[in-house]
């Protein structure tokens, strides 16, 4: 019994002097562990007489309980002390200025798209959307693009299979609309389009807005006036020189491309306009009769007017960006300028 009480006395002294949780763990191992002093005494009970064994076992277990209680109390005290030290070390100086939340903003392409859409909606255009994965009929055939046309080549178009492609323009949306909606029609079709091209002025994915008017009295003069008004409103220039040059597109006849006087040098000639003083901004024309026939619209009764605008192109000109790829690199230093 004297040995047992001595173990308890030593444990009390050690627990009282313990400075951290590791000290307590060392004591627990030395006294209560598998090879601890009390465990060894319990294993030796078999050597005692039947009369001594119960009393000794009871005494050892009582000492064990007392030590466990002392350990638990001391552990709680040490944990509280450690927590107080942590609070002191991590205290917050409430006098420091607060951290401002980083404000997000729209991407310049989204800003440009919204601006273009709002200008056309004010002119009674309806915004329509369509699938980005198209079949050859909607992307090529219905738009009077023959099978031998270079635009159908593998090096220009992304093919899923022989008949399925990533759309190369948003014109298929116009065909789908005309299948469901009879004239008069006045729509714009914005969205992503895909072509196999990558340099400072081209990316494999870019954005377009294509417009379509189908009505009995539509004419090219009407289209020309509409686009001139749009360009002047977009660039916020009441006086903006615009010229139309003859061009060729399979889905329009006649076809034209519109140039504006360089907004960088005011027509004097610079690197952006390649010293020409003019910048190409869009393509347009009168819808080819074959396109109207593909959706069962009589080209003798109705006339279609179409135009296509590259959103990145207009964004580059408005914001003075000289490399198209900057729009897609997700560099916060670049994007922050447009907030």
From Swiss-Prot:
User: What EC identifiers does the entry list?
Assistant: 6.1.1.20
Residues that hold Mg(2+) according to the record: 253
The answer to whether keyword rRNA processing applies is: no
Q: Where is the protein situated, by its record's location annotation?
A: Cytoplasm
Q: How is the cofactor bound?
A: Binds 2 magnesium ions per tetramer.
Please give the Pfam families that the UniProt record associates with this protein. Answer: Phe_tRNA-synt_N, tRNA-synt_2d
User: Which spans of this chain does the record mark as coiled coil?
Assistant: none
So which domain of life are we looking at? Bacteria
Which reactions are catalysed by this chain?
Answer: tRNA(Phe) + L-phenylalanine + ATP = L-phenylalanyl-tRNA(Phe) + AMP + diphosphate + H(+)
Keyword vocabulary terms for this entry: Aminoacyl-tRNA synthetase, ATP-binding, Cytoplasm, Ligase, Magnesium, Metal-binding, Nucleotide-binding, Protein biosynthesis
Q: Which cofactor does it need?
A: Mg(2+)
Subunit structure comment from the entry? Tetramer of two alpha and two beta subunits.
Q: Which PANTHER family match?
A: PHENYLALANINE--TRNA LIGASE, MITOCHONDRIAL, PHENYLALANYL-TRNA SYNTHETASE
Q: What family does the Swiss-Prot or TrEMBL record give for this protein? A: Belongs to the class-II aminoacyl-tRNA synthetase family. Phe-tRNA synthetase alpha subunit type 1 subfamily.
Q: What is this protein called?
A: Phenylalanine--tRNA ligase alpha subunit
Which gene produces this protein? Answer: pheS
């Amino acid at each position: 019994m004297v040995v047992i009480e001595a173990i308890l006395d030593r444990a009390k002294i050690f627990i009282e002097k313990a400075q951290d949780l590791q000290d307590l763990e060392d004591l627990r191992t030395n006294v209560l562990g598998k090879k601890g002093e009390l465990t060894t005494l319990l294993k030796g009970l078999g050597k005692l007489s039947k009369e001594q064994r119960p009393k000794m076992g009871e005494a050892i277990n009582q000492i064990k309980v007392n030590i466990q209680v002392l350990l638990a109390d001391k552990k709680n005290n040490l944990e509280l002390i450690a927590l107080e030290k942590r609070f002191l070390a991590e205290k917050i100086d409430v006098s420091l200025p607060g951290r401002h939340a980083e404000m997000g903003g729209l991407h310049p392409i989204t800003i440009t798209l919204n601006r273009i859409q709002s200008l056309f909606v004010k002119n009674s255009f309806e915004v329509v959307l369509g699938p980005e994965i198209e079949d050859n009929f909607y992307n090529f055939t219905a738009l009077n693009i023959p099978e031998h046309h270079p635009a159908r080549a593998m090096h220009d178009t992304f093919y899923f299979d022989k008949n399925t492609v990533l759309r190369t323009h948003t014109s298929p949306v116009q065909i789908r609309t005309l299948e469901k909606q009879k004239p008069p029609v006045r729509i714009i079709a914005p969205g992503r389009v895909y072509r196999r091209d990558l340099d400072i002025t081209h990316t494999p994915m870019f954005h377009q807005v294509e417009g379509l008017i189908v009505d009995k009295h539509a004419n090219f003069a009407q289209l020309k006036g509409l686009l001139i008004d749009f360009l002047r409103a977009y660039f916020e220039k009441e006086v903006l020189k615009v010229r139309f040059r003859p061009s060729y597109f399979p889905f329009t006849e006649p076809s034209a491309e519109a140039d504006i006087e360089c907004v960088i040098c005011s027509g004097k000639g610079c690197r952006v306009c390649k010293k020409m003083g003019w910048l190409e901004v869009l393509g347009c024309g009168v819808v080819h009769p074959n396109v109207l026939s593909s959706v069962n619209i009589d080209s003798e009764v109705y006339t279609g007017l179409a135009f296509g605008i590259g959103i990145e192109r207009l964004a580059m000109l408005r914001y003075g960006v000289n490399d198209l790829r900057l729009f897609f690199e997700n560099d916060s230093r670049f994007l922050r300028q447009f907030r």
